[in-house]
Amino acid sequence: MRTTPMANASTIERKWLVVDAAGKTLGRLSTEVASILRGKHKPTYTPHVDTGDHVIIINAEKIELTGKKLTDKIYYRHTQHPGGLKSRTALEMRTNYPEKMLELAIKGMLPKGSLGRQMFKKLNVYRGSEHPHEAQKPEVYELRG
Protein backbone atom coordinates (compact mmCIF):
# COMPACT_ATOMS: atom_id res chain seq x y z
CA MET A 1 0.00 0.00 0.00
CA ARG A 2 1.30 3.47 -0.85
CA THR A 3 1.37 6.17 1.75
CA THR A 4 1.87 9.90 1.47
CA PRO A 5 5.44 10.78 2.49
CA MET A 6 5.48 13.01 5.56
CA ALA A 7 8.34 15.36 6.33
CA ASN A 8 10.12 15.04 9.65
CA ALA A 9 13.09 16.75 11.25
CA SER A 10 15.64 14.36 9.74
CA THR A 11 14.42 14.65 6.12
CA ILE A 12 14.22 18.46 5.88
CA GLU A 13 16.76 20.29 3.70
CA ARG A 14 17.12 23.87 4.92
CA LYS A 15 18.57 26.66 2.80
CA TRP A 16 19.65 30.17 3.75
CA LEU A 17 18.02 32.91 1.66
CA VAL A 18 18.83 36.63 1.48
CA VAL A 19 15.98 39.05 0.75
CA ASP A 20 16.65 42.73 -0.04
CA ALA A 21 13.91 44.92 1.48
CA ALA A 22 14.96 48.12 -0.33
CA GLY A 23 11.95 49.64 -2.06
CA LYS A 24 9.62 46.75 -1.15
CA THR A 25 6.20 47.21 0.46
CA LEU A 26 6.05 46.03 4.09
CA GLY A 27 2.99 43.77 3.78
CA ARG A 28 3.89 42.16 0.47
CA LEU A 29 7.42 41.39 1.66
CA SER A 30 6.15 40.07 5.00
CA THR A 31 3.62 37.66 3.51
CA GLU A 32 6.18 36.09 1.22
CA VAL A 33 8.84 35.81 3.95
CA ALA A 34 6.29 34.27 6.35
CA SER A 35 5.42 31.71 3.67
CA ILE A 36 9.12 30.83 3.24
CA LEU A 37 9.59 30.50 7.03
CA ARG A 38 6.63 28.09 7.15
CA GLY A 39 7.95 26.06 4.22
CA LYS A 40 4.90 26.53 2.00
CA HIS A 41 7.12 27.08 -1.06
CA LYS A 42 8.34 23.47 -0.87
CA PRO A 43 6.56 20.37 -2.15
CA THR A 44 7.39 18.66 1.16
CA TYR A 45 5.34 21.16 3.20
CA THR A 46 3.75 19.54 6.24
CA PRO A 47 1.55 21.68 8.54
CA HIS A 48 2.71 20.12 11.82
CA VAL A 49 6.46 20.17 11.00
CA ASP A 50 8.75 23.19 10.62
CA THR A 51 9.90 22.68 7.01
CA GLY A 52 10.86 26.31 6.29
CA ASP A 53 14.16 27.87 5.30
CA HIS A 54 16.30 30.47 7.09
CA VAL A 55 15.69 34.02 5.85
CA ILE A 56 18.05 37.00 6.11
CA ILE A 57 16.46 40.38 5.37
CA ILE A 58 18.84 43.25 4.57
CA ASN A 59 18.20 47.00 4.11
CA ALA A 60 15.28 46.99 6.56
CA GLU A 61 15.43 50.80 6.89
CA LYS A 62 14.50 51.16 3.19
CA ILE A 63 11.12 49.40 3.51
CA GLU A 64 8.15 51.25 1.99
CA LEU A 65 4.63 51.85 3.26
CA THR A 66 1.75 52.87 1.00
CA GLY A 67 -0.68 55.72 1.55
CA LYS A 68 -0.47 57.76 4.74
CA LYS A 69 0.61 54.82 6.90
CA LEU A 70 3.96 56.43 7.78
CA THR A 71 2.16 59.10 9.79
CA ASP A 72 -1.16 57.38 10.61
CA LYS A 73 -0.15 53.81 11.55
CA ILE A 74 0.64 53.52 15.25
CA TYR A 75 2.57 50.75 17.00
CA TYR A 76 1.58 50.16 20.64
CA ARG A 77 3.50 48.48 23.43
CA HIS A 78 2.96 48.25 27.17
CA THR A 79 5.54 48.43 29.96
CA GLN A 80 3.38 46.17 32.20
CA HIS A 81 3.11 48.99 34.74
CA PRO A 82 -0.10 50.95 35.39
CA GLY A 83 -0.51 53.67 32.76
CA GLY A 84 2.42 52.27 30.78
CA LEU A 85 0.91 52.23 27.28
CA LYS A 86 3.47 53.63 24.83
CA SER A 87 2.94 54.41 21.17
CA ARG A 88 5.11 55.18 18.13
CA THR A 89 4.20 56.08 14.56
CA ALA A 90 5.42 53.97 11.66
CA LEU A 91 7.81 56.78 10.69
CA GLU A 92 9.46 56.67 14.14
CA MET A 93 9.64 52.87 13.96
CA ARG A 94 11.22 52.91 10.49
CA THR A 95 13.74 55.55 11.56
CA ASN A 96 14.74 54.06 14.93
CA TYR A 97 13.72 50.37 14.89
CA PRO A 98 13.29 49.13 11.29
CA GLU A 99 14.20 45.56 12.30
CA LYS A 100 11.41 45.48 14.90
CA MET A 101 8.89 46.82 12.38
CA LEU A 102 9.55 43.95 9.97
CA GLU A 103 9.72 41.36 12.75
CA LEU A 104 6.31 42.40 14.14
CA ALA A 105 4.70 42.22 10.69
CA ILE A 106 6.13 38.76 9.94
CA LYS A 107 5.51 37.37 13.44
CA GLY A 108 1.82 38.23 13.14
CA MET A 109 1.60 36.09 9.99
CA LEU A 110 3.12 32.96 11.56
CA PRO A 111 1.19 30.35 13.58
CA LYS A 112 0.58 31.20 17.22
CA GLY A 113 2.20 28.59 19.44
CA SER A 114 5.44 26.67 19.86
CA LEU A 115 5.76 25.83 16.15
CA GLY A 116 5.36 29.49 15.19
CA ARG A 117 8.01 30.53 17.72
CA GLN A 118 10.37 27.91 16.28
CA MET A 119 9.74 29.25 12.75
CA PHE A 120 10.32 32.85 13.88
CA LYS A 121 13.80 31.96 15.17
CA LYS A 122 14.88 31.34 11.56
CA LEU A 123 14.36 35.03 10.69
CA ASN A 124 17.30 37.46 10.76
CA VAL A 125 16.67 41.15 9.99
CA TYR A 126 19.45 43.73 9.50
CA ARG A 127 19.34 47.49 9.03
CA GLY A 128 22.09 47.82 6.40
CA SER A 129 23.27 45.69 3.52
CA GLU A 130 25.82 43.76 5.63
CA HIS A 131 25.02 40.58 7.58
CA PRO A 132 27.19 38.12 9.58
CA HIS A 133 25.90 34.95 7.85
CA GLU A 134 28.33 34.66 4.92
CA ALA A 135 29.59 31.30 6.25
CA GLN A 136 26.14 29.76 5.55
CA LYS A 137 26.48 30.67 1.83
CA PRO A 138 23.02 32.25 1.51
CA GLU A 139 21.30 32.44 -1.88
CA VAL A 140 19.73 35.69 -3.10
CA TYR A 141 15.94 35.28 -3.24
CA GLU A 142 13.93 37.43 -5.65
CA LEU A 143 10.41 38.17 -4.47
CA ARG A 144 7.45 37.61 -6.77
CA GLY A 145 5.85 40.68 -8.26
From Swiss-Prot:
SUPFAM superfamilies: Ribosomal protein L13. This is Large ribosomal subunit protein uL13. Part of the 50S ribosomal subunit. It comes from the Bacteria. Belongs to the universal ribosomal protein uL13 family. NCBIfam families: rplM_bact. GO terms for cellular component: cytosolic large ribosomal subunit. InterPro entries: Ribosomal_uL13, Ribosomal_uL13_bac-type, Ribosomal_uL13_CS, Ribosomal_uL13_sf. This protein is one of the early assembly proteins of the 50S ribosomal subunit, although it is not seen to bind rRNA by itself. It is important during the early stages of 50S assembly. It holds the Pfam family Ribosomal_L13. Transmembrane segments: none annotated. GO terms for molecular function: mRNA binding; structural constituent of ribosome. One of its GO terms (biological process) is negative regulation of translation. Keywords: Ribonucleoprotein, Ribosomal protein.
